[in-house]
């Protein structure tokens, strides 16, 4: 089964604008769909809300920066979060530990507990699976060239 072209277009838009302020109202205006319909369609196709998708991608992108010595405020703002508090809360909801603990995990700091280590490992695995699933969804869209039909009455 092919991916929904509208959802693929929305995913591409979100990915291209992931570090900027994104609102459901803005998306519904750009794609000319009712906000409620768009949210239902997105959830039905991907089994995740638009906001959860955006937050997951932002957290995934921020993980790369956590390997550096950049401060957490800079990382949160550069990945589209309004505040360090919202970034930390979202990070903990998705990854299971706060960004500082995850940074220790990335740097193989021995001060993290075994439970934190397991949580970080499992969360990273799940996040990678999610990102790969979305990438496959985007690549599985049926292009317009496949819809070419010839009307036999005009031959």
Language model: regions and residue ranges:
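Generic alpha-helical secondary structure signal
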Residues: 17, 37, 41, 57, ...
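…primarily DNA-binding HTH/wHTH and HhH modules…
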Residues: 89-155
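Sequence-specific DNA-binding recognition helix
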Residues: 24, 30, 35-42, 66-103, ...
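An amphipathic alpha-helical interaction segment
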Residues: 1-19, 25-41, 145, 150-152
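Terminal helix-turn-helix DNA-binding modules in bacterial transcription factors
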Residues: 8-16, 21, 25, 44-82, ...
């Amino acid at each position: 089964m092919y991916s929904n072209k509208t959802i693929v277009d929305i995913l591409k838009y979100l990915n291209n604008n992931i570090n900027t302020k994104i609102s459901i109202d803005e998306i519904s205006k750009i794609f000319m769909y009712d906000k409620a319909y768009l949210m239902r369609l997105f959830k039905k196709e991907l089994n995740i809300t638009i906001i959860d998708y955006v937050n997951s991608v932002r957290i995934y992108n921020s993980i790369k920066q956590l390997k550096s010595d950049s401060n957490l405020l800079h990382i949160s703002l550069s990945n589209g979060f309004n505040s360090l508090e919202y970034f930390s809360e979202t990070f903990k909801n998705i990854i299971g530990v706060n960004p500082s603990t995850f940074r220790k995990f990335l740097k193989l700091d021995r001060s993290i507990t075994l439970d934190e280590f397991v949580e970080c490992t499992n969360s990273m695995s799940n996040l990678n699976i999610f990102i790969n699933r979305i990438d496959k969804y985007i690549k599985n869209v049926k292009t317009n060239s496949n819809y070419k039909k010839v009307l036999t009455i005009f031959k």
